[in-house]
């Protein structure tokens, strides 16, 4: 294996959504440095942070139709039964909700929690309160995705936060998705809520760190030890 290939394989890819921001931060660094030298280094630090923010690493996803994986990197901020948002059209019965809060240092690529077909995508305008607050699921700008899976409908809601002002969803209605597949992102701090059937067996707890496409949030079977995996 060549040295160049080793270096290439060791570098985490950057998502193309970040290119304009990275260029803008670097140009701003040059301009600030022209005004006052120390400002260049300040701008350069922000540029490096921007590169880090838009990283898009590959993930090894467990391929088990009975499991629900995390759609986001971050901290589990809520676990419990809740009535899903009306716009998801998932009924008025309580479903199990797991919320994942992403801070500005989290990887913000969002991944499908299950394999299935996207039944609906619903965008709802709203406010930009702290995404870590429970009321954010009701009042903040958000984008809801409903996936028809082996175990019924699973809802995923991308929620904007104080800093995040841009929700991106690349998938479309009627698209087929695989668990762990990239479907969108939210820029600069946010939250994802996952709504699952109430009978699911939870595998996470509040305060736990989750990895998108890898951490199992819950399962519909009792066996959590064996499965196949896929690189995403």
From Swiss-Prot:
GO terms for biological process: phosphatidylethanolamine biosynthetic process. Binds 1 pyruvoyl group covalently per subunit. It comes from the Bacteria. Is synthesized initially as an inactive proenzyme. Formation of the active enzyme involves a self-maturation process in which the active site pyruvoyl group is generated from an internal serine residue via an autocatalytic post-translational modification. Two non-identical subunits are generated from the proenzyme in this reaction, and the pyruvate is formed at the N-terminus of the alpha chain, which is derived from the carboxyl end of the proenzyme. The record marks 189-190 as: Cleavage (non-hydrolytic). One of its GO terms (cellular component) is plasma membrane. The modification Pyruvic acid (Ser) is found at residue 190. It is an enzyme of class 4 (lyase). The active site is at 190 (schiff-base intermediate with substrate). It is a peripheral membrane protein. GO terms for molecular function: phosphatidylserine decarboxylase activity. Keywords: Cell membrane, Decarboxylase, Lipid biosynthesis, Lipid metabolism, Lyase, Membrane, Phospholipid biosynthesis, Phospholipid metabolism, Pyruvate, Zymogen. InterPro entries: PS_Dcarbxylase (IPR003817), PSD-A (IPR033175). It catalyses: a 1,2-diacyl-sn-glycero-3-phospho-L-serine + H(+) = a 1,2-diacyl-sn-glycero-3-phosphoethanolamine + CO2. Pathway: Phospholipid metabolism; phosphatidylethanolamine biosynthesis; phosphatidylethanolamine from CDP-diacylglycerol: step 2/2. Its EC number is 4.1.1.65. Its main location: membrane. The keyword ATP-binding does not apply. It is found in: Cell membrane. HAMAP family: PS_decarb_PSD_A. Catalyzes the formation of phosphatidylethanolamine (PtdEtn) from phosphatidylserine (PtdSer). Heterodimer of a large membrane-associated beta subunit and a small pyruvoyl-containing alpha subunit. PANTHER family: ARCHAETIDYLSERINE DECARBOXYLASE PROENZYME-RELATED. This is Phosphatidylserine decarboxylase proenzyme. It comes from Bartonella bacilliformis (strain ATCC 35685 / KC583 / Herrer 020/F12,63). The gene is psd.
């Amino acid at each position: 294996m060549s040295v160049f290939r080793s270096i290439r394989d060791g570098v985490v890819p950057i998502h193309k959504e970040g290119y304009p921001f990275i260029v803008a931060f670097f140009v701003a660094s040059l301009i600030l440095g022209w005004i006052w030298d120390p400002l260049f280094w300040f701008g350069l630090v922000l540029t490096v942070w921007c590169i880090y923010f838009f990283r898009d690493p590959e993930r090894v996803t467990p391929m088990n139709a009975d499991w629900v994986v995390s759609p986001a990197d971050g901290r589990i901020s809520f676990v419990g039964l809740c009535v899903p948002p009306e716009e998801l059209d998932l009924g008025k019965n309580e479903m199990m909700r797991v919320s994942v809060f992403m801070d500005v240092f989290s990887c913000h690529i969002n991944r499908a929690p299950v394999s299935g077909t996207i039944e609906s995508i619903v965008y709802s305008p709203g406010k930009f309160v702290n995404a870590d607050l429970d009321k954010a699921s009701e009042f903040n700008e958000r984008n809801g995705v409903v996936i028809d899976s082996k175990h019924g409908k699973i809802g995923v809601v991308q929620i904007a936060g104080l800093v995040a002002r841009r929700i991106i969803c690349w998938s479309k209605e009627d698209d087929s998705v695989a668990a762990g597949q990239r479907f969108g992102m939210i820029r600069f701090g946010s939250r994802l809520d996952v709504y699952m059937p109430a009978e699911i067996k939870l595998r996470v707890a509040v305060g736990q760190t989750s990895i998108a496409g890898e951490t199992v949030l819950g399962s519909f079977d009792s066996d959590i030890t064996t499965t196949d995996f896929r690189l995403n």
